[in-house]
Amino acid sequence: MNSIDDEILFIGTAEAEHVEMYLKAIWHLNESNSPVKISTIAKMLHVRQPSVVQMLKKLNTKDLVEYNKAGVSLTENGERIGSSMMRNSRLLEVLLDSALKVEIDEEMVCGIEHHMNKQFTDALCTMLKHPRKCPHSHDIPMGECCENIDSN
């Protein structure tokens, strides 16, 4: 009865998570009206500046950012992914803090947020009654499930 065929395992791609973290960092800088600088991104993500430059070039070729001498900005696709990652993260923080009454573990939140699909995120948002703010008082980007809901 206990067969290896009963268990389905997945190996996530670190590359996809790295892309999402860069987009989330840029999205957060935009949200806070901070300049999007290589040094700031490097500091936020605890990486070296050459790593940021290399990733920004990659994101530029994937049409997720516009990166040139003038600076860095998110494309429509980059904005969508960055907003989605921030939504996932902040909803998880509300879950931990308000619903489960446990201390927010940012590393755990970061690990989970990359694996949340739209159905799960919308169900979590609905279960939490469509919160508008995370425990840190930041706005939670609205999803389609929030469109017909009055502001809390």
Where does each model-flagged region fall?
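Short, hydrophobic-biased segments on the C-terminal half of alpha helices
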Residues: L56-K57
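Basic, amphipathic "hinge/linker" alpha-helix immediately C-terminal to the N-terminal HTH DNA-binding motif
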Residues: A70-N88
